Swiss-Prot record:
GO molecular function, a single term: alcohol dehydrogenase (NAD+) activity
PROSITE patterns the record matches: ADH_SHORT
Name of the molecule in the record: Dehydrogenase OXI1
Record keyword Iron-sulfur present: no
Function: Dehydrogenase; part of the Tox1A locus, one of the 2 loci that mediate the biosynthesis of T-toxin, a family of linear polyketides 37 to 45 carbons in length, of which the major component is 41 carbons, and which leads to high virulence to maize. One of the PKSs (PKS1 or PKS2) could synthesize a precursor, used subsequently by the other PKS as starter unit, to add additional carbons.
Reactions catalysed, as given in the entry: a primary alcohol + NAD(+) = an aldehyde + NADH + H(+); a secondary alcohol + NAD(+) = a ketone + NADH + H(+)
Signal sequence residues: 1-20
Amino acid sequence: MTETFKVAITFVSPSSEALAQSIIDSINKSADTTRAIKIQADMRDTDSPLRIIDATICAFGPNIDILVNNAGVESLVSLSELGLQDFNECIDVNFRAVVFMTKSVIPYLRSPGRIINISSSSAHAGGLSSGIYAASKAAVEALARFWATSLGPQGHSVNTVVPGLTQTDMYERIIAEESSAAYHRTVASMTPMGGRVGTPEDIARIVSLLVEPRSQWVTGQTISATGGLILL
């Protein structure tokens, strides 16, 4: 099944802007009209959700069908080194932004709407950091279960996708440190399917499946996209 969507892609930094622009160019070159736009938004800013919605409806009209809550920032500091700034940044981006982005989209979400939260395998595994990142992602999974119940009567589904290690900009920054690189190589080797880390395309395919009409009966679910590393 081939679906055609109009897409608003957000980015934060100049480095991510280049990637966002390349995706937009790829989408728009195959269409007669503009089908993709980019929006600069730092989800630490409390006004970002409304700015994203405003820019989206200005470009494409007042109906929104899908929201993917994908913004994230990782905290690798230990509990003994955890500061209030580290805590707030992680919670603000990974949790608070999901709450208020979803709140902002609801008035424009056309039934049957789809909301996809992106969690992390860290929410289901131990580690050596403070655990704030894992906790913030576990909270996102809890939100999806509650919203699936409260938004279901309006025809909306809410699900969570749980990626494992995935080759993103954040991943590349983390493995730049040799100690982190060794750990990630070990985890990758433990992945049953292929012994590798995931790719953005691996995760996108799962999200794509969840937004299809044939997935309308799936809601409130937490779906592992880890190549079998995390079994839920």
